[in-house]
């Protein structure tokens, strides 16, 4: 049987990330980004093989951008497209696995929008546009939260009145599940272990970051919570702060809830600490030039990351290794070294040459000889979404 092609779509409020995934090949035949949708500057950019190109699509919405994309996808797939996988950020407690999309599922995703007001409505825009343009193809939703539905109750419940959970779904959900699942499977493969008999601490580090405790292929704890704001220091998100900060700022500065939410999500994290940038690459360069804010932001980021990994270890029966992934995790030897240095009680130590070598897509072990595994594994959420989609077509 010839190998199958899946189009993977990830829709933001004004963007669409897309990748054509062939089950038999590691490289994407076609991938790209439509951005600034709804504006005069809307543009579609793509790469096919070694070639890059772009097309201005003024005022295009999600449907118009996907319509422009359709002939490119069909051409790159040789006329054989077998399904479409959609990334959906929040599935609440309703979805524990990838799910074939139909009217009932779409309404259930819509019902979870209050849990992810910035993400789920945008995801739905893409789903509805794609289902209109590709009516004859199977469509599958893959949820960021689904992998974490295996968390035990003592890990996902907040110490709040029970009615808030029972009536309003206030609990920890976790995110980046597709990435954590993908890299934990790759880690077991690299280590020669069975997925069902392995335990990992995973750190997905990018503009959004989270840690995860993974035992026998299941998530048992994770750092993000009800929303992606909980947990680690991130690019522009604060991560954990005193829960009373909202009332303190409202009382002393007169800030509204909207102003506080915007500050915590868009003005904090690495950007807030450094007063410079949310980009770790920029901060590392400025740190070398003696910028105190950049140095502080990196120190806080790594210390908080190490604290979270240590906390996640409570869910593990043994430690088979620590995984670094995501844009920062895959490309910052400095962050990996500083984080591991804080975890000396775990007897972790890095091989400096191996750590320096694992950047720009290079995977591998970076631990010193005789010490517990530390692995750098490039994530591939698009391939995992495609595999989940294919599994429902079999």
UniProtKB/Swiss-Prot annotation:
Origin: domain of life: Bacteria
Subcellular localization, as worded in the UniProt entry: Cytoplasm
GO cellular component, one term: cytosol
HAMAP family for this protein: Acetate_kinase
KW Magnesium (keyword) present: yes
Cofactor(s) annotated in UniProt: Mg(2+); Mn(2+)
PANTHER family reported for this sequence: ACETATE KINASE
InterPro entries hit by this protein: Ac/propionate_kinase, Aliphatic_acid_kin_short-chain, Aliphatic_acid_kinase_CS, ATPase_NBD
Record's protein name: Acetate kinase
Residues reported to bind ATP: 17, 204-208, 279-281, 327-331
SUPFAM superfamilies, per the entry: Actin-like ATPase domain (SSF53067)
Keywords carried by this UniProt record: ATP-binding, Cytoplasm, Kinase, Magnesium, Metal-binding, Nucleotide-binding, Transferase
Residues holding Mg(2+): 10, 381
